[in-house]
Regions:
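Compact alpha-helical subdomains of small soluble proteins
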Residues: 9-20, 28-29, 44-105
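Cell-wall glycan-active module
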Residues: 41
Length: 105
């Protein structure tokens, strides 16, 4: 799957392990665990060469969120857009958070 990054550069994203439907089939504890892991994974992107500035919006947005808050954002995003059921959950999660978080530079 390809998405547009902040700089409008097209990047290719691997499929990950789950789809939006898989997420909705998870228990609440599994959703919270997934949400925690997804945030942790995104926050270490600079270890893999991503500019630290690219995750500042995520740090600011999720600073005071609980795992339940993040899981609810993902659930609401998938639930409000049926097309998300068949998409790769890693990309759906990013888009859900980007949609829920204020845009910052």
């Amino acid at each position: 799957m390809s998405i547009y990054a902040h700089s409008q550069q097209t990047v290719s994203i691997g499929p990950g392990f789950f789809t939006g439907k898989d997420y909705l089939d998870m228990t609440d504890n599994e959703r919270r665990a997934y949400a925690t892991g997804a945030i942790n994974g995104m926050l270490v992107a600079p270890f893999f060469g991503a500019p630290a500035d690219n995750v500042n919006w995520l740090k600011a947005c999720t600073l005071k969120m609980s795992d339940e808050d993040v899981a609810a954002i993902i659930s609401k995003y998938i639930g409000s857009q049926e097309s998300q059921l068949n998409y790769n959950l890693n990309v759906v999660t990013f888009n859900a958070l980007r949609n829920a978080c204020p845009k910052t530079k």
